[in-house]
A protein has these predicted regions:
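Extended terminal accessory/targeting regions
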Residues: 2-5, 18-149
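Bacterial N-terminal signal peptides
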Residues: 9-18
């Protein structure tokens, strides 16, 4: 009887393990396109919502967003000391996730405009001379992504 109990227990454990392996991967929530859109608009509120989510990525794991970034790619992340890195990270987020969704072409212009607006917000607190230099640099970055992607 003891052997039978042990055999049944071993079988139950094997079946339990097998069931765990066969669990299907869950699809992303149906509102993923709306969430992505909300985080990639040109407004400061959109940027702030994305920034908050980026700081709490675990809360958004079910959406399978691509949070990876190379920041400003081949360009400096902080040109002339202006901190463009996080704006570039949001731009990467938009590019990578819209490409994965297959809707990049329809959203590229807005994503590039959002980068430019983000960069101008980085520049806004500087004094007149530094702000002009920063805005000029922001314009150059915007033109580069607009043309080169």
């Amino acid at each position: 009887m003891r052997r039978l109990s042990m055999a049944l227990a071993a079988t139950a454990m094997t079946i339990g393990v097998g069931v765990g392996v066969a669990t299907p991967v869950q699809a992303a929530p149906a509102d993923k396109p709306q969430v992505l859109s909300g985080w990639t608009q040109t407004s400061a509120a959109s940027y702030n919502a994305w920034w908050s989510a980026r700081q709490n990525q675990g809360n958004w794991a079910a959406y399978n967003f691509d949070w990876s970034t190379d920041y400003c790619s081949g360009s400096p992340d902080n040109p002339l000391g202006f901190p463009f890195q996080n704006s570039c990270a949001r731009h990467d987020f938009g590019y990578r996730n819209y490409k994965a969704a297959g809707t990049f072409a329809a959203n590229k212009a807005r994503l590039d405009s959002a980068l430019y607006e983000d960069l101008k917000r980085v520049c806004a607190p500087y004094g007149a001379v530094a702000r002009a230099t920063c805005n000029s640099t922001a314009w150059t970055y915007y033109q580069a992504v607009k043309i080169l992607g």
